[in-house]
Amino acid sequence: MFSPDTNSEFYDDFYTKYNTNMAPTTSTFNAQPRLSLDSGLGLTNDSFYSTDLNETHLMDISAGNASTSFQSQPPPQLESSPPTKWARIRTPPNRKKKISHEGPNQEALPPGFNLFSPPSRKKIKTAFSSPPPKSMKTPDSLRKSIRISSPSPFKVTFSKTPLKLSNNENVTGIHIGRSGTYYNKQVTGSASKRCLLPSKPDGFTFLGSPGNSDVLDFPLQTTFEGFGDLDTPAKINAALEVNNDDSMDYYQYAGMIETSSSLATYTNSTGPLVENHARNLKSVPISRTASRNLMKISRKSVEEPVPEPQAVHVEPVIEKPTKISAKKEKEQKKSAAKEAALKEAKEKEMRIWKLAPFETPKKEVPLYSGRWLVISTGRTLAQQELFSDAKSFFKANPPPAPRAPQAPELASGPRRIPTIQRVTLFKHRYRSPRD
C-alpha cells in the first residue's frame, strides 16, 4: 500500500495524464485520496457509493464539531489502494445492534447460556415425550387396518358387566393389517375365577393347530373345583360354531349365547360347553384372529371317530322296466334300418372296386389328391397283384452269377452323359413349361 504523504503528487499526475473519464477523487481542501475497500468492482451507480473518504470520516466523527475538528487537527493516516478507473465500493456499516451479555438481563439467564447454541437433547426429549393433545387421533387408514380381537369363543372370560377391550385381561391378540398378529401372553389362565372353561381344549392354540402349543405359557389343568357362585350363561348357540366371520365383536358374540341354568349337567371339562357329546367331538377350537384358511386346515386335521358298522338288512331293489313310448320306438327302428342299408351299400361298393381291374385315369389326377396318392404309391389292387407276381417270378428264376470284372475298354469318342427320362403311370405325360 502507498502512503498518502509520499504519493500525493503521483496521484495528481496520474489522474491528469491517464484518467480522462473521471475527475480526480481528491478533495479541493485535502490532498489525501479516498479509501477503497476492494479492487474496484462496481456493480451499481458510482454516484451512490463513491463518496469522499474525508467527508464520510468527518460525518462519522462528529456532525456538530466537523468544521473545528477538520481545521484544527490533521486527518488520520489511512491506507489507500492504487488508483483504478472502476467505481469504488464502500462497505455499508453494520446497523445490527450487538447483544450485550452484561446487564440486568444477564443475571436472569442460567450460567453458560448462549442464544446461538443448539438446544440440548434433554429439551428435545421432553418436548416429544409430553402427552399428545386431545385433538390428536389415529389416522383413519391406520384405524381400519388395526383390529383388536375379543377372547376366543372357547376360552371366554365372562363378567356381570360388559367386557371392554381396553382391559388387557380381555384381549387375546391384536391383528395389525398385513404385519401379522401380536398375541397377549398374559391372557387370563385357566385358574381365573372369571373363566368359563377350567382348562384349554386338547391341542388348542391361538392359530388353531397343535403345532403352536408354545404360544400359551400355562399348563393344562386336569382338576376342576367348580365355578362358585358366578352367574354365567351356560348354553352356546349352535350358530356360533358355524359362523366363521373374523369381524364378530363381543356384543355380537354375547347375543348368540342363550342363557340357561343347567350348568351342572355338563361334565366334560376339556372342550367347549355344548349340550351333546357327539357335537363336542365335531367342534374344533379356533381363534378369532386366525385366518379362514387355517381354520379349514385345522378342521381337516381333526380325525372324527368312525362309528362301528352295524348289520342293517337292506331289501333288494327290483328295477322296473322303463316304459318307452310307441313313437320313440318307431324312430329307433327307422334309424337302425337306415344305418344297416348304408353299411351294406358301402360293402358292396368295396367288393366291386376290388374285383375291377386297374384302369389308367383318362383325365389327369389332381396333384397330391387322395387318388393321386394311392396310384403314385402303388396301393391299388392291380399294382399290388403285379408286384406280388414279379416278386414270385424273381424268386423262381434267380439271375445268373456275375462274371469276374474285366478292365473297361476306353471309348474312342467323347463320353456320353445319360439323360433321365420321365416315367409316368399315365398315358399323357406331364409336359414341362420348357416343352
Swiss-Prot record:
Region (Disordered) location: 65-146, 393-419
Superkingdom in the source lineage: Eukaryota
Bilayer-spanning residue ranges: none
GO BP annotations, alphabetical order: asymmetric cell division; Wnt signaling pathway
Coiled coil: 322-352
UniProt keyword Nucleus, yes or no: yes
Tissue-specificity statement: Strongly expressed in the cytoplasm of the pharynx muscle cells and several head neurons, probably the IL1s or IL2s, throughout development. Also expressed in some other unidentified neurons in the tail region. Weakly expressed in the nuclei of the T-cells and the T-cell daughters. Not expressed in gonads and in P12 cell.
Record localization: Nucleus; Cytoplasm
GO cellular component annotations of the record: cytoplasm; nucleus
Keywords, sorted A to Z: Coiled coil, Cytoplasm, Nucleus, Wnt signaling pathway
Purpose of the protein: May act synergistically with the Wnt pathways to control T-cell fate specification, gonad development, and P12 cell fate specification. Required for the distribution of pop-1 and tlp-1 proteins.
UniProt-recorded name of the protein: T-cell defective protein 2
Organism of origin: Caenorhabditis elegans
